[in-house]
């Protein structure tokens, strides 16, 4: 434990928190071919592989995931939310931060309803999270 004088001289340093979505913190200067520090809420990328993964214990399922090469050159694993999707290799997608608790290493979500990603069909609740359009009212 430091003495009072040591604290007066040096003070306490605040711990720096590491980002939960580090790939969104980097940009890319294509002229200089260097990464830059440029935070973004989302990033565009191209799917390099679309596959399924099994979750950690005690869960059991086939979670849909995609390996995405971002516009800053970083390749990440991202989760495809919702039921059914139209993604394949070379699809252009938008990713956001947000981990999937039972898939280790999956720290990003694909945004549904933007770029090449279609919204979830026949979705009636929480539509904005899945890029689903408002359904037409039924005729009476």
Swiss-Prot record:
Cellular-component GO terms for this entry: small ribosomal subunit
Residue span of region Disordered: 1-44, 120-140
Keyword vocabulary terms for this entry: Methylation, Ribonucleoprotein, Ribosomal protein, RNA-binding, rRNA-binding, tRNA-binding
CDD domains hit by this protein: Ribosomal_S12
Comp. bias intervals (Basic residues): 121-140
The protein's assembly and partners: Part of the 30S ribosomal subunit. Contacts proteins S8 and S17. May interact with IF1 in the 30S initiation complex.
Family matches, as NCBIfam families: rpsL_bact
Family according to the record: Belongs to the universal ribosomal protein uS12 family.
Name of the featured protein: Small ribosomal subunit protein uS12
Organism (species): Lachnoclostridium phytofermentans (strain ATCC 700394 / DSM 18823 / ISDg) (Clostridium phytofermentans)
Gene name, Swiss-Prot/TrEMBL: rpsL
């Amino acid at each position: 434990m430091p003495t009072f004088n040591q604290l007066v001289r040096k003070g306490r340093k605040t711990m720096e928190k590491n980002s939960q979505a580090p790939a969104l913190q980097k940009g890319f200067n294509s002229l200089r071919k260097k990464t830059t520090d440029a935070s973004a809420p989302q990033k565009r990328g191209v799917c390099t592989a679309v596959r399924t993964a099994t979750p950690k214990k005690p869960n059991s399922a086939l979670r849909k995931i995609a390996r995405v090469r971002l516009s800053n050159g970083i390749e990440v694993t991202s989760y495809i939310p919702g039921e059914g999707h139209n993604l394949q290799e070379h699809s252009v997608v938008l990713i956001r931060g947000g981990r999937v608790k039972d898939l280790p290493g999956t720290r990003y979500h694909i945004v549904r309803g933007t770029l090449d990603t279609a919204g979830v069909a026949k979705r009636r609740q929480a539509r904005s999270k899945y890029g689903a359009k408002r359904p037409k009212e039924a005729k009476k």
